[in-house]
From Swiss-Prot:
Pfam families per UniProt: GrpE (PF01025)
Disulfides per UniProt: none
This protein's record includes keyword Chaperone: yes
Lineage top rank: taxon: Bacteria
Protein name per the record: Protein GrpE
Native species: Xanthomonas campestris pv. campestris (strain ATCC 33913 / DSM 3586 / NCPPB 528 / LMG 568 / P 25)
């Protein structure tokens, strides 16, 4: 027994009065609920951050490939100008020079907008960028390398817009 306060027994202090048990249960219940709310808030925050990243990536892709349709429709124009330059030969003339200048200006504008020309003569065949239309033999070109290009290919911001149509050197 406690001598200062005989009404309190030290053994009584170690035991919980019956009315505190429901309070402890409620405190534990509230702690569990707080933990669940914190976990939900953390998940929501992570979902929001993932959504922000996804939207930023989508906006970046939309910006990078906004000109895809226009540049794709200009590819036949590039082909025609290239064919015209080939047909005009190598002799300088005002018409050929004008055609060459126009072609170079158009290619520069396209390049400034992310277009890259694929002209793979002499390079190893790459099925991700080239479409083989036949095989042939060529002096000085290793087997499996591009011998001739029938139609140039193009990349738009490193994504294939049109494969190059090529002839590949035969393997012996």
């Amino acid at each position: 027994m406690n001598q200062d306060h005989p009404e309190f027994d030290s053994e009584d202090l170690s035991q919980n009065p019956p009315e505190t048990d429901p309070l402890k249960a409620e405190i534990e219940s509230l702690r569990s609920e707080i933990a669940l709310v914190k976990a939900d808030a953390l998940r929501e925050r992570a979902d929001l951050e993932n959504q922000r990243k996804r939207i930023a990536r989508d906006v970046e892709n939309a910006r990078k490939f906004a000109n895809e349709k226009l540049l794709g429709e200009l590819l036949p124009v590039f082909d025609s100008l290239d064919a015209g330059l080939t047909a005009a030969g190598t002799e300088p003339s005002p018409l050929r020079d004008g055609l060459d200048l126009t072609y170079k200006q158009l290619l520069k504008v396209a390049a400034d907008n992310g277009l890259t020309l694929l002209d793979p003569v002499g390079q190893p065949f790459n099925p991700d960028q080239h479409q083989a239309i036949s095989q042939g033999e060529a002096e000085g070109i290793a087997p499996g390398h591009v011998v001739q290009v029938f139609q140039k290919g193009y990349l738009l911001n490193e994504r294939l817009l049109r494969p190059a149509l090529v002839v590949v050197a035969k393997h012996d």
